[in-house]
């Protein structure tokens, strides 16, 4: 639990630093050092080094899968701080507090990825979502940001109520909050247990913006400050999916035949709605919001298959999707025009940035030789083993083909259209380009040698 202790400590530290009057550069450097230490701490824990072994009444226990996911999340978080840390200053005056909230969110990530009690799962999700409400509405001068925060809070509270009701029904059916005892006693499910299971399923589907519980996503992502939208759309979504997979694998694995068809239906619906609606978007920010819904559909295939390849696919999807989306949003944050036309002629103005964006978009589309292609392949392979798997996989492949169209609209704007007269592009610093180049290289390397990441699941 190295990361839990360090994240909590650094979150409190960033709160006190805000009172010291330090410069933005110093605050940003301290935050980057903290996130780098979180990443190194997960690597150290994988090698057996623990600062302190927390027990917490055996309500959470970290396994190899959780550690690998946390290493991916903290590594991407470090890159996120390098790319977007400076842009947080443009949101408001509470610069240090933004970093503090993100560190507290990482505390929630640890609980979501290590819970063995339904209460700890609930606590972890709330530790993640409450700071997100604040970050969404952090641009207090912007009415869209305020509206997005209110929508997110109200709908999130409704989703939390569903989860609590589900946990209560499961406790009433089994007399325990322990996920391991639920799986041991779930040979013959009762109506009470099934009711709790589906309430939790629907609640978590809302958290990951799976259809038909996705309706909040475009407005919230569009209204939130862009610098925080990238964090919400990547690390938060990935961590929620990893917890989703852990819950249904550990607690409800023996009831797989009961909920599997529902997971498949939600995956198909999410893929169709996300991809079809993304086609009609003119704003790149809203396009990425609907794209994130479609990507949630692919991640849902891992839950639907929940067998060989599902965990490997989830880890690879977490890395490829997070890296590509963080890179695209970091560039989008600095653009003057968020529409697709705003990218017209970018390849002539700055071919290096355009090339990196092209790699990221190709990865999101699932083009071969990128990490996104192998991530989708693992998910499709996992789905094939499920009931009606072939039908679901065919629909998923068709929707992946649709996604190629709207991602290529951005590529077309960058490479095959001239910039509008008077259009101005931001100047990207050398350090910013170096970090983006590193992300593009990671996407390509993982697309060719995924074992560099996946072997940590077993060794």
Whereabouts are the PLM-identified features?
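Alpha-helical transmembrane segments of multi-pass membrane proteins predominantly involved
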Residues: 1-459
């Amino acid at each position: 639990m190295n990361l839990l202790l360090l994240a909590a400590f650094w979150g409190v530290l960033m709160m006190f630093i805000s009172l010291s009057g330090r410069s933005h550069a110093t605050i940003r450097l301290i935050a980057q050092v903290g996130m780098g230490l979180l990443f190194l701490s997960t690597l150290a824990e994988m090698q057996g080094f623990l600062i302190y072994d927390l027990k917490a009444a055996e309500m959470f226990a970290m396994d190899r899968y959780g550690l690998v996911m946390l290493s991916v999340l903290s590594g991407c978080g470090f890159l996120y701080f390098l790319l977007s840390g400076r842009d947080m200053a443009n949101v408001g005056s509470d610069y240090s507090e933004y970093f503090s909230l993100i560190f507290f969110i990482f505390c929630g990530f640890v609980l979501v990825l290590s819970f063995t009690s339904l209460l700890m799962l609930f606590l972890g999700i709330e530790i993640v979502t409450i700071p997100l409400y604040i970050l969404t509405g952090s641009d207090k001068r912007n009415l869209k940001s305020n509206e997005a925060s209110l929508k997110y809070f109200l709908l999130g509270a409704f989703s939390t109520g569903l989860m609590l009701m589900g946990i209560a029904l499961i406790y009433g059916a089994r007399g325990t909050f322990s996920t391991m005892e639920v799986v041991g006693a779930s040979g013959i499910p009762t109506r009470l247990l099934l009711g709790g299971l589906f309430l939790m399923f629907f609640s978590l589907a809302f958290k990951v913006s799976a259809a038909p519980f996705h309706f909040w996503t475009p407005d919230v992502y569009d209204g939130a400050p862009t610098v925080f939208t990238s964090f919400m759309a990547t690390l938060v979504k990935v961590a929620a999916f990893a917890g989703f997979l852990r819950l249904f694998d550990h607690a409800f694995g023996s009831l797989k035949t009961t909920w599997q068809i529902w997971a498949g239906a939600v995956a198909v619906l999410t893929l169709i709605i996300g991809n079809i609606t993304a086609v009609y978007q003119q704003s790149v920010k809203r396009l990425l919001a609907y794209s994130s819904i479609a990507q949630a559909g692919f991640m849902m295939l891992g839950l639907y298959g929940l067998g060989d390849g599902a965990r490997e696919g989830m880890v690879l999807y977490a890395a490829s999707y997070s890296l590509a989306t963080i890179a695209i949003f970091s560039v989008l944050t600095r653009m003057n025009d968020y529409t697709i036309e705003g990218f017209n002629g970018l390849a002539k103005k700055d071919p290096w940035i355009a090339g990196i964006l092209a790699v990221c978009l190709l990865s999101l589309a699932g083009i071969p030789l990128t990490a996104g292609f192998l991530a989708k392949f693992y998910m499709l392979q996992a789905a094939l083993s499920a009931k009606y798997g072939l039908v679901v996989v065919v629909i998923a492949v068709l929707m992946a083909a649709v996604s190629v169209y709207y991602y290529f609209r951005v590529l077309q704007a960058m490479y095959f259209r001239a910039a509008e007269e008077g259009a101005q592009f931001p100047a990207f610093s050398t350090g910013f380009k170096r970090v983006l180049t590193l992300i593009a290289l990671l996407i390509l390397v993982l697309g060719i040698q995924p074992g560099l990441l996946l072997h940590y699941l077993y060794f």
